[in-house]
């Protein structure tokens, strides 16, 4: 008779979880940051708020963002004036948009990832879907399963309302699933649409205005699995270690609340300070066992919550400017896409590494780190190993 331990052994993969493919997608509507303040104050009927507009213009100028992509066009906003008012009851209108658009955008990214992976979609065993945009039953995971035509017995995990750290969360969960289920192939999708947070400006809620200057829409998808099939599957990164922690004394630093007016969010001014204060401890925990203490010797993928976070992390760790190049590039081209951001940066890094003729997918380096920061204040850490190109 077979023992439980023998069954357990047979159920586990032999090797570590690897990222086998990456796909990304954005809405067609591209917004230029330089002209966005004019558009935003006009569409929200707020042009009389001259000082507030000047303040918003300064926020946009300092954001280090050149462009963003948004589902919300001028036409859609004119048809839904409740979204343009500050705190007007508008949840129904927002929900009607995002329950359709979130899985649709996720499908676009997933189709690209599946194509790169090169295996039939029938080999997908697990699906992780993550979004901060809207809640519904059955969820976006179910809708995506239908849209892609996945098998009805794919094992699904739906993560709602996680926020900006969740790009790390989905990797952590995908790693555990891939390594503990022999032959598992996990489709990971993060899809974010700002229709839940868009609203007119207010003198009394400046952190909402910060969000209007930073957030953009995007979806990213990965295929994750252990023991890649030779000749067919080509690993891009190996996931070595993961952690999640709540930063001490950070309660209320970032939070969001779903209300009749949509998703409202609040952040303390010292969010960059809290992140930079706790980053060293997270790095020591992750890299001391590997004998790495020079953080300029690893590649970097950090959630670009805003330029101030990146600036303070660089300063605290004395990082060379090029360490955050891929991160800043994604922030500049797309804005803050919440959970999808770090997955876009993974894609940017591996493409640029190949284009520049470097030896590995991680800018020619072997080891790297991926950080997610978000509500809590929660920090996700993922240790990555690159793959030879």
From Swiss-Prot:
Keywords: Acyltransferase, Flavonoid biosynthesis, Transferase. Pathway: Secondary metabolite biosynthesis; flavonoid biosynthesis. It catalyses: (E)-4-coumaroyl-CoA + 3 malonyl-CoA + 3 H(+) = 2',4,4',6'-tetrahydroxychalcone + 3 CO2 + 4 CoA. The active site is at 164. It is an enzyme of class 2 (transferase). The keyword Acyltransferase applies. Transmembrane segments: none annotated. PROSITE patterns: CHALCONE_SYNTH (PS00441). GO terms for molecular function: naringenin-chalcone synthase activity. The keyword Acyltransferase applies. It comes from the Eukaryota. GO terms for biological process: flavonoid biosynthetic process; polyketide biosynthetic process. Its EC number is 2.3.1.74. Pfam families: Chal_sti_synt_C, Chal_sti_synt_N. InterPro entries: Chalcone/stilbene_synt_C (IPR012328), Chalcone/stilbene_synt_N (IPR001099), Chalcone/stilbene_synthase_AS (IPR018088), Polyketide_synthase_type-III (IPR011141), Thiolase-like (IPR016039). Belongs to the thiolase-like superfamily. Chalcone/stilbene synthases family. The primary product of this enzyme is 4,2',4',6'-tetrahydroxychalcone (also termed naringenin-chalcone or chalcone) which can under specific conditions spontaneously isomerize into naringenin. This is Chalcone synthase 3. It comes from Trifolium subterraneum (Subterranean clover). The lineage of its organism: Eukaryota, Viridiplantae, Streptophyta, Embryophyta, Tracheophyta.
């Amino acid at each position: 008779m077979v023992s439980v331990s023998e069954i357990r052994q047979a159920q586990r993969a032999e090797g570590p979880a690897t990222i086998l493919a990456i796909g990304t997608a954005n809405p067609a509507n591209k917004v230029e940051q330089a002209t966005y303040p004019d558009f935003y104050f006009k569409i929200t009927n707020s042009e009389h708020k001259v000082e507030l507009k000047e303040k918003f213009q300064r926020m946009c100028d300092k954001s280090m963002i050149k462009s963003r992509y948004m589902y919300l066009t001028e036409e859609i906003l004119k048809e839904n004036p409740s979204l343009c008012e500050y705190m007007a009851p508008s949840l129904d209108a927002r929900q009607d948009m995002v329950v359709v658009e979130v899985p649709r955008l996720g499908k676009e990214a997933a189709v690209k990832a599946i194509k790169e992976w090169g295996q039939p979609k029938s080999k997908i065993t697990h699906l992780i879907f993550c979004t901060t945009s809207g809640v519904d039953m059955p969820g976006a995971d179910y809708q995506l399963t239908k849209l892609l035509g996945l098998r009805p017995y794919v094992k699904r995990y739906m993560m709602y309302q996680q926020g900006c750290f969740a790009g790390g969360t989905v990797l952590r969960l995908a790693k555990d699933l891939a390594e503990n289920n022999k032959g598992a192939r996990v489709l990971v999708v993060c899809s974010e649409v700002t229709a839940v947070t868009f609203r007119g400006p207010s003198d009394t809620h400046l952190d909402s205005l910060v969000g209007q200057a930073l957030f953009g829409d995007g979806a990213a998808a990965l295929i994750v699995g252990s023991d890649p099939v030779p000749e067919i599957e080509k690993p891009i990164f190996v996931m070595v270690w993961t952690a999640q922690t709540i930063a001490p004394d950070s309660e209320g630093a970032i939070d969001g609340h779903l209300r009749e007016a949509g998703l409202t969010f609040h952040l303390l001014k010292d969010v960059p300070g809290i992140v930079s204060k706790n980053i060293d401890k997270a790095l020591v925990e992750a890299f001391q066992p590997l004998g790495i203490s020079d953080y300029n010797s690893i590649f970097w993928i950090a959630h670009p919550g805003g330029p101030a976070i990146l600036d303070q992390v660089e300063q605290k760790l004395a990082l060379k400017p090029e360490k955050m190049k891929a991160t800043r590039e994604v922030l500049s081209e797309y804005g803050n896409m919440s959970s999808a951001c770090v997955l876009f940066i993974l894609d940017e890094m591996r493409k640029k590494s190949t284009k520049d003729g470097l030896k590995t997918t991680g800018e020619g380096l072997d080891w790297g780190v991926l950080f997610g920061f978000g509500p809590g204040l929660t920090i996700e850490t993922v240790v990555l190993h690159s793959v030879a190109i």
